[in-house]
Structures are given as C-alpha cells and as structure tokens.
Amino acid sequence: GVVGNQGAYFDERDRHLIYIDGSLAVMSFQLALETLGLSSCCINWPSIFQLEKRMEKLLGLEEHERVVMFLSVGYPDPEGLIPYSQKKSVDEIRSYNNCQGAR
C-alpha cells in the first residue's frame, strides 16, 4: 500500500496533500514499472473511519499515517486487449448557432 504521513505537513489545510503527493509518486513509479515490462493498477482506498482503523492495525500504522491507495503489480497478459474508443470527427460534433436576426 501507499501510505501518506500527515505529520510531515504543518497546517490542517494541508491534510489532503498526502493524496496529491502520493498519487504523483505512484504515477512516476508506474512509468518506471512499464520500462521493466510490468503493468500496474491503482486501487482506491476509501476514507471510511472503521476501515481506516482496521487498516491502521493490520499495517501497524501510526496515528498520523493514512493509506492513500494500493497498487497491484504484475506481468501483463500478452494477449490482453487494450480498450479503445473511436473519437468523433470535428464535423460530427461541431455546430454553429444561427445568428441571423440577433441584435
């Protein structure tokens, strides 16, 4: 799991920074994993008090530490498909307002 240390921030207003900083660090880590031929998937961890307490106990976290997310890592299926959505052309989505008579 990815754990943030809220004790590293000095002000209450910074309490959400562990999620931003943790996510940025994981993004770089995921890119590094790709260079090694590994795939990864971020797994959201909900901020629910009862779950937080259970996870603190399971991982032996300090009171100021919070789970940011989990990350699964493994080798990709060489025959796995990659999702693709065909984008609409500009002509399909562009429209013009009829401005005749407007003042």
Place the predicted regions along the sequence by residue.
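Acidic, surface-exposed loops and disordered segments
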Residues: G1-R103
